[in-house]
Amino acid sequence: MTHAPTPPAASNFLRPIIEDDLQANRFQGKLWAGKPGPAALQAQGQPDPARIRTRFPPEPNGYLHIGHAKSICVNFGLARDYGGVCHLRFDDTNPEKEEQEYVDAIIEAVHWLGFDWQADGNDNLYFASDYFEFMYEFAEALVQAGHAYVDEQSAEEIRASRGTLTEPGTDSPWRDRPADESLLRLREMRDGKHPDGSLVLRARIDMASPNINLRDPVMYRVRHATHHRTGNAWCIYPMYSWAHPVEDALEGITHSICTLEFEDQRPFYDWILARLAELGKLARPLPHQYEFARLNLTYVVTSKRKLLQLVREGYVDGWDDPRMPTLFGLRRRGYTPSSIRLFCDRTAVSKSDSRIDYSLLEQAVRDDLDPVAPRSVAVLDPLKLVITNYPEGRSETCSAPRNPHDPQAGVREFPFTRELWIEQDDFREEPPKKYFRLFPGNTVRLKYGYVVRCTGFTKDESGKVVEVQAEYLPDTKSGTPGADSVKVKGNITWVSAAHAVPAQVHLYDRLFADAHPDGGDKDFLACLNPNSKQTVQAWLEPGIEAVPGATWQFERLGYFTVDSKDSRPEAPVLNRIVTLRDSWQAA
């Protein structure tokens, strides 16, 4: 197989920023008390051993997908490369949608991807819910300082009063209520004395700001809901735009790296941090938010709503279906953690939205597996080949490299017998031009075995060819003197019919046939690829140990792995990871 040239390292606009920060000693004097906390706690700490701190902050309301992998690699990778620490933080501020199941799955997925958050004796696994008391304390401080107020308008009234991109908003009638009155209402909200949606806490900023996100954004809302960690201890929950900067500051994050949709929220992020630092609640230096373009792939949807619809309506077989873009789906498909990291490293970290061709992900797993995957042979669409002049009952050993790139891997041995399985596509009764495989009268090499000449074939009642006959040339066995005395143009793979291992093989392909299934007004379900999964009964080279997760390159076919859920020692099930070459047109 011809190797594609290794792509150059992708650009990352964040690296020069971090290098400038470190060169300017912007974090010199930053203290760390060994755990997150407000300014008073951090003042008791020691100089932070981490040169930078980043974080990966998923909400535990679903399974991680390939887009999350990019953010994971960016945040953990930058921390690793610059002597820092990356925190894993769960932004669990929305109790109706979050579950412990997702927490456990996210932890497993990040670990599987090859990253750890333990450093300097700290676990660095955190939850936004750990900071609810701090957030509430800070909210009271903002109210008392005149920076926030409790609004009793309905959600519809608040929405209508925000204005538009071209028109300013209008002040709430509650905007100028006395701080003591707002504080009383906030405490009533905290104590559960008001129903859902009746009151909110809003920041007092500027209702005429050209940035709508600064028009007195909501900070707290009433939600009488059970939280997966705190139970019923709270009935008010922070909005993400309020919680996010507070969490970052409490954890001593230096570089808060988000996707582009949070760019318009950055002024509020900075406003919150500045006000709380002025009030002595947060330690300086304060975090800074940076935004990069999210990873968008062709032939993929990553919307949680759409992925959930695929699962619930039975278009796929669960969240770990090998066609899904979830990390568990990719893992079951046979993608390795290193292949996903390689793919992420090859895609730029930039501020420009773009769509990456799915073939780059497939090429990453090819490049990752090619040097290490043992070779073997499988016949997916079997046709019987009988060597008529080979003695019945006889068997001899053929050999081949386990991996041509790794001489230390040694050789594999497999039997040659009178009856073999070959691919249906390797025989033609009437061959087209430039067809060099088996057809009546033609000579080919059985790879690693003998040269054979086709002498005939047999059809069933429907006219389908069910058996091919051939004669072998005894002095042409691969690896023996004179093996190349007969020149042939075709090589075909085979397995011994008497020794081959039967297996079920799932031939997976892209889930969508349309490169942009979620573009415009498309019905994404109408873009599904009807051939994204085909199941065949195959014959495998003997000697294969069908251990879940084991991976091979089946010669001429692609890379395959043993399914982690359905495979059994007595009944192997394999998944095709990727073909040897890309068969799709570039999007």
UniProtKB/Swiss-Prot annotation:
Residues reported in the UniProt entry to bind L-glutamine: 91, 240
Motif 'KMSKS' region per record, residues: 301-305
Record's keyword terms, sorted: Aminoacyl-tRNA synthetase, ATP-binding, Cytoplasm, Ligase, Nucleotide-binding, Protein biosynthesis
Subcellular location: Cytoplasm
Transmembrane regions listed in the UniProt entry: none
Residues spanned by motif 'HIGH' region: 58-68
Protein name: Glutamine--tRNA ligase
Organism: Bordetella pertussis (strain Tohama I / ATCC BAA-589 / NCTC 13251)
Gene: glnS
